[in-house]
């Protein structure tokens, strides 16, 4: 190819993050060098997809060359590998933007997440989508010649860098649209300037690319004859994976396709491939990743499926096909019913999309149910990564609330390590005879809820309680009313009624005790005044003297903290003070003649109950003063 003289040549510096990334990548990914070709082919495939899409409305972009392909060649003597595509190409500005910076939100977070552990870092880097920069794993100099479709031949661009902090860029003539990347191999990397080696890498990683990938045909001249003209041959299958029958596709092919679309180095946990025919016609291939992306909780992070219409790529990150709580799902949806000029705005309003969304959501939930049932250990890993996001489900997806609830996992009083492994179905299978409720307790930490006085009566009766300590849990439970016909009960809320789990004698005895302590209830109420909404005898306690319960309609502590943190006004609410009439401290309080001392003891018990509930004291100094006064009296 003849190139004209370079003009407007300048040397620019890489964005800081690129420098760091290059350094890390060259070291972290070195053990799996051959992936550079997969990454570059993946980029070339995206460039061709973009051209196909833009050419629908501007056919002149094809410039008379509608046969789209990728070519990989090599030169043993020059020690180069060249990859060429006739896709959309780049302008000078594109080259500076795409090859000099990482145009992706969350870059700083990504850098913070790098640990120095090679295995973990290579996963993170892969997940971040190193793409083009992987060329520097095997090359000490990379040159890019490109021209964006639709620009003049004189507006080509030549970019080159040694990957050490800066790059050169110049304007050149380039007759053909698209991009050519020339890798000047490092010493010791000559193995890649070889037809068979390159063929094997293409077969291994890029067989699923729905675009012909050509390599020079291996041909030798017969003795005494000239070397024949260069011929090319297609070395990949070049058909869209999701359009092929499932029976013909190997697991390895599904896994490689996932790595291509998910920019991931790990195999997915699970996948679901379906073709729907009838009123709506579409194919879908959905994947559950093995690990959460670092930007899972950033609202602006990229999410959504790749959308194709009749096998023509239309857009990345089409968000309208799955609800937000399934934003970690990767995959492809290919519809026959949408028009090719579909936009994101249209997707949000199209009734066809609503039908597809509900079917795809059900498909994902079925896939997760299957994973939980058949691969409980794998599901445990899934839950660690994505459990908090799944907990957003019941609020967002009313139609599938019961299905999502079945996929949730909790810690409970059955275990002693706080691991969230108990499903609601398991909980009910272990429930006591006559138990028609699912009991739970929310709190800040596992240690706090595990040792909460609210659990005393449940321990005594051997009733399992779910322990919820994620920040989202109280909010989740405001949307989960029941599961399998059994309602949820917060053991710290309202007046605890164990229903059939208390015998008639126990109920009668509790009523009599409450009646006999009416005088004490009034005295404590007068002493605590506005600090409480109510004082009553407790049915929950066996060992502790007192606890604070939450009113039936009041906000719990977790919810109050979330609202306060987001700057919202939180309504005032006062706790209910419950005491254990059989506790020696309460008996002593009941017999106390001095009103001043009675007041001090009541306040100390109230403050201790607040601390046990994980709350902070409104007046810690007053608590310390009362406690010290009591200690002095006891020591006299």
Curated annotation (Swiss-Prot):
Molecular chaperone. Has ATPase activity. Residues 562-636 are annotated as: C. This is Chaperone protein HtpG. Homodimer. The keyword Cytoplasm applies. One of its GO terms (molecular function) is ATP-dependent protein folding chaperone. GO terms for cellular component: cytoplasm. Signal peptide: none annotated.
